[in-house]
A protein has these predicted regions:
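A short, Lys/Arg-enriched amphipathic alpha-helix followed by its capping loop at the start of a domain
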Residues: 30-34
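Non-catalytic, surface beta->alpha helical segment in thiol-disulfide oxidoreductase systems
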Residues: 62-88
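Small/polar loops that bind or transfer phosphate-bearing groups
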Residues: 12, 41, 69
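Short glycine-biased active-site loop of nucleotidyltransferases that positions the nucleotide triphosphate
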Residues: 50-52
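Structural micro-motif
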Residues: 54-60
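Thiol-based oxidoreductase modules, predominantly thioredoxin-like and allied folds used
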Residues: 36-47
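Local sequence-structure signature of Cys/Sec-based thiol-disulfide redox active-site neighborhoods
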Residues: 2-29
Length: 88
């Protein structure tokens, strides 16, 4: 029988980014249902994070892999989290 685990989801965001606010709200709403660990990272003031993510915000990573930028597709997000949870 395959075991499941709690995937790690990271959302990179910045103040004043309306797409970020929407993605954060969506991810927060799905957290309890899908059982993932959530880390929210404000990139403002960190030159390395700004260089890596500013033009793509929001950026959503699942288990360290960039999966979504700009808009979060809810069905695809659910599938990606479920796939990550099934990995051993």
């Amino acid at each position: 029988m395959a075991s499941t685990r709690n995937p790690s989801v990271v959302v990179y965001h910045a103040p004043g980014c309306h797409l970020c606010e929407r993605a954060l709200a969506q991810v927060r709403a799905l957290r309890a249902e899908l059982g993932f660990e959530l880390r929210e990272v404000d990139i403002s003031g960190d030159p390395a994070l700004e260089a890596a993510h500013r033009e793509w915000l929001p950026v959503v990573e699942i288990d360290g892999r960039r999966r979504f930028t700009y808009h979060l597709q809810l069905d695809a997000f659910r599938r990606a989290v479920a796939q990550a949870a099934a990995l051993e």
